[in-house]
UniProtKB/Swiss-Prot annotation:
It comes from Halorhodospira halophila (strain DSM 244 / SL1) (Ectothiorhodospira halophila (strain DSM 244 / SL1)). This is 4-hydroxy-tetrahydrodipicolinate synthase. Pathway: Amino-acid biosynthesis; L-lysine biosynthesis via DAP pathway; (S)-tetrahydrodipicolinate from L-aspartate: step 3/4. GO terms for biological process: diaminopimelate biosynthetic process; lysine biosynthetic process via diaminopimelate. Belongs to the DapA family. Keywords: Amino-acid biosynthesis, Cytoplasm, Diaminopimelate biosynthesis, Lyase, Lysine biosynthesis, Schiff base. One of its GO terms (molecular function) is 4-hydroxy-tetrahydrodipicolinate synthase activity. PROSITE patterns: DHDPS_1 (PS00665), DHDPS_2 (PS00666). The record marks 53, 116 as: Part of a proton relay during catalysis.
Amino acid sequence: MTEVVMFRGSMVAMVTPMKAQDGIRDAVDEKALKQLVEYHVEQGSDAIVAVGTTGESATLDYEEHRDVIRATVEAAAGRIPVIGGTGANSTWEAIELTRSAMEAGCDAALLVVPYYNKPTQEGLVQHFSAIAEAVPIPQILYNVPGRTGCDMLPETVERLADLPNVVGLKEAQGTVERAEEVIRRCGDRLDVFAGDDFNALGMMRVGGKGVISVSANVVPRQMHDLCAAALAGDMQTAEAINERLTPLHQAMFCEPNPVPVKWAVEELGMAGSGMRLPMTRLTEAGQARVRQAMQDAGLL
C-alpha cells in the first residue's frame, strides 16, 4: 500500500476493459486495464477505484474481482492510491472480498450498501461493523439507494463513523442536503465524497472532500483541477470547470452506467466498449448525445 491515508479530490471510478466476445463471458483485458491506470497516473487522478459499479462488479466473479484489483495495484505501483470495490449483499462475502483487496495491496475498500435484500438500518450497522472489525483496512461506505433499494440514513452513518476503519462515505443519494446533514452529524470523524459528478461541486461547498467520479474516466485532468480548486477555496475556477463539464456529467448517465462511459472511453481509443450481458452497447441516440457532450468538453 502507499502511505496515503486521507483521500481527497477526484477519485476515478475506473471502467474494467473487456475483450468483446459473446457478451456473456467476455474476458477482462488486463493489458488495456494497465494502460488505463498509467493514463490516470499521468493525468493527475487522485485515486483509482477498481471494480466499483462503473467497473462492472456485478458481472465479475470472485476470482475476477481479485484479479482486476491485483492488476490495478500492480500497475499503480504505489504512485496513486487504489481503492478496491468489495461490497456485497452477504456480510461474509464482503469480508472475504475486503480481505482479498487488503492482501493485494489496496489502500482502502469501497463497500456498497447491501443490495436487493434491503436490510434494516440496524442490519446495516451490524453488516459494516462486522467488516470493519474483521479487516484492518480503511473503508469507505457507499450509499446509492437508486441501485440498492436501501437508503443508509445519516443517523446510521453517524453510528458507523466511530468505527476505527471507517474513514469515509460515498454519498449518491442525489442531494447536496443529504451530504450536508451527514457532515453536520459526523464532523471530522468521517469524510464525505460525492457519488455523482453533477453535484460534486455542491458537496464540496458544504464540506465534502471530493468525488468518486465517472466522468474522470475521460476528463481526469479536468476533474482533478475542479476538485483541487474547490478544496483550495477557489470557487471561481471550480465553477468555470464545472459549467464546462456539466453536459458531459449528464450524458454519462443518459443510459445506465457504465454503458455511456465505456463507449466514451472507446471513442478516445483507450479501451473497447465490450461489456457483459445484461448490459448492452450504447444506443445510437445515446452515442449522439455522448459524442456531442465530448465535443463540447473539447475531447473530440
